[in-house]
Amino acid sequence: MLLNQPKILVVGATGKFARWVIPELMRRDAVVHALVRNDARAAVARSLGVAEVFIGDLRNTDSLAEATRGMDGVFYIGPAFTPDEAAMGIAIVEAAERNGVKKFAFSSVIQPTNTRLKNHASKIPVEEALYSSRLEYTILQPANFMQNIGIAWPSIILHGRFGEPFPKDIKIARVDYRDVAEVAAIALTEDKLAFATLELAAGMFSRNDVVAAISAELGRPIEAFEPSFSEWVQSARLPYSEQQMHLLSKIHEHYRNYGLGGNSLSLTAALGREPRSLRDYIRELARQNDPSTPHLAKDS
């Protein structure tokens, strides 16, 4: 075990996914510090209850040195589809090692060695940097996030259908990122996951499975449909460049041809319980839409 109340730096602490790590660390008596990119994000981080906020840039080694100094552990998830993602990840690993950080939890991606997908392969150099460091690393390789369904939820409710740009019977591995966050917190506050590399999924689900769960929870039929990639992008209004969209299109092309494999064995073992199921996640979304059940946590 680390010392009581270990100091943990959460990089990008106000992001859609990194923020889930903060309450899990706090439940384990960690003192959470945040690295964010501007004053507006700093205010959000403080509202989440962190003890200290650093404003910095993953491309600025001085800010990384300042943020990692005196920390017992670091949680890191890289910015998606960024051209220099690998370099930024290596920089935070090197800063952590130079400053004597003990533990490092990296939220990578399932199947990073699928080098046909450049955004998957961009995690490999970061993993290699950890393997070649003196840090007690834990590498988390999560599947497709269930929270992506949550992002589409307003449209699902409004239009009564859910679309992704691959066939509706194709199964892909999905995971509730809150479970990934819990594993990260365990890794950063205990020793049992030190030097583990873990594929994290709750199981494999098709879009037919997703809409069946939604229909059951809402009590009305929801349709699964297959938009083209361009139609899906236009509907999703993603804040990505043309190059980032190209990388994303390759992921969905892979899903179309091969699906995405994964099982819940590693996640169940790491959590010491069954992971949150697809039905559990859908049920929470449905309750958020019910005015009689306020105050539930949202994905964003």
Region locations from a protein language model:
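Cofactor-binding loops of NAD(P)H-dependent oxidoreductases
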Residues: 55-56
